[in-house]
UniProtKB/Swiss-Prot annotation:
UniProt-listed Gene3D superfamilies: Periplasmic binding protein-like II (3.40.190.10), Winged helix-like DNA-binding domain superfamily/Winged helix DNA-binding domain (1.10.10.10)
Family the entry assigns: Belongs to the LysR transcriptional regulatory family.
Pfam families: HTH_1, LysR_substrate
Name of the molecule in the record: HTH-type transcriptional regulator BlaA
Organism expressing this protein natively: Proteus vulgaris
Domain HTH lysR-type, first and last residues per copy: 5-62
GO molecular function: DNA-binding transcription factor activity; sequence-specific DNA binding
General function of this protein: Positive regulator of the expression of the gene (blaB) for beta-lactamase.
Gene name, Swiss-Prot/TrEMBL: blaA
Binding region for DNA: 22-41
CDD domains per the UniProt record, alphabetical: PBP2_BlaA
Alphabetically ordered keywords of this record: Activator, DNA-binding, Transcription, Transcription regulation
Length: 292
């Protein structure tokens, strides 16, 4: 038998946690500030915990409140999404994904048409980020990240590595006969300062001062290398189209591996059938990438 959930109290808490203010929550819910405060107090009594620290100019969530808020955010978001789809008469199961921008544009997007043909009843909601993501508070099913797979709250499945290499336009590449020739070029880098240092070490050369701009994401760095000159350090796998059409060249075969792309999802979130389908499809596509 299911436990009777105090839905009004949960809604009052969720709005209060989002605004960190009872008055703003009351305006959103079309009730009085006193009613919201009372609902939250009832919820605290039922759970046996304190959810907010009452401050002179607002509220501060306790650790217990943070846990409850992350669950409710996902739940209310899912309910609202499905409700709107029923209203429009176009219900489809949605899988929400956040991906590093370089991966999303350079690798995932060109493959999504095939997924949609195979699974027309599954709608993929894709957004990009700079490798910083909170699956719980953002209501995400999956996040595709770059790194070493050491995220404690998620299941982390390796997709493939994407070694960094020197990329530039064909004109910029003409005088580059040896890695030390880079001393005469403008070198771009991402927010990770150590990337070039590790590439220099792999090339058995002394470090060169990085004088170019700092870019986040890598795609902006590549655009600058193509249209303004300069040299980028980026994963060639993510820019295969630009290499194939001659916009980019790889003047040296030297590559440095600093991590992998990973498919991650919360340990606390049950896997839906549509999530299983997307996960299996993505892992199969990643295997194709590795075998090529």
């Amino acid at each position: 038998m299911r436990t009777h959930l105090p839905l009004n109290a949960l809604r009052a808490f969720e709005a209060s946690a989002r605004h960190l203010n009872f008055t703003k929550a009351a305006l959103e819910l079309y009730v009085t500030q006193g009613a919201v405060s009372q609902q939250v107090r009832m919820l605290e009594e039922r759970l046996g915990v304190i959810l907010f620290k009452r401050l002179p100019r607002g509220l501060e969530m306790t650790d217990d409140a943070q846990i409850l808020f992350s669950v409710l955010t996902t739940a209310f978001s899912d309910i609202e999404r499905v409700f709107k789809q029923f209203e429009r008469g176009e219900y489809r199961d949605v899988v929400s994904i956040a991906a590093v921008g370089t991966f999303a544009v350079g690798w995932l997007l060109p493959r999504l048409a095939e997924f949609r043909q195979l699974y027309p009843r599954i709608e993929l909601n894709l957004r990009t980020n700079n490798n910083v993501v909170n699956l719980a508070t953002e209501g995400l099913d999956f996040a595709i990240r770059f790194g070493e797979g050491l995220w404690p709250l998620t299941h982390n499945k390796a997709l493939f590595s994407a070694p960094l290499t020197v990329l530039c336009s064909s004109d910029t590449a003409k005088p580059l006969q040896h890695p030390t020739d880079l001393i005469n070029e403008t070198l771009y880098r991402s927010y990770r300062e150590d990337e070039w240092l590790q590439w220099f070490e792999k090339a058995n050369m002394s470090p060169i001062k990085i004088t170019g701009s700092i870019f986040d994401p890598s795609r902006l760095m590549i655009e600058s290398a193509i249209y303004e000159g300069g040299v980028a350090l980026a994963p060639a796998k993510m820019f295969s189209r630009e290499i194939e059409n001659g916009q980019l060249v790889q003047p040296f075969k030297i590559e440095v591996e600093l991590g992998k792309y990973w498919l991650t999802y919360l340990k606390s979130k049950p896997m839906t059938a549509s999530m299983e389908i997307f996960q299996q499809w993505l892992m199969n596509e990643a295997l194709k990438e590795i075998s090529e």
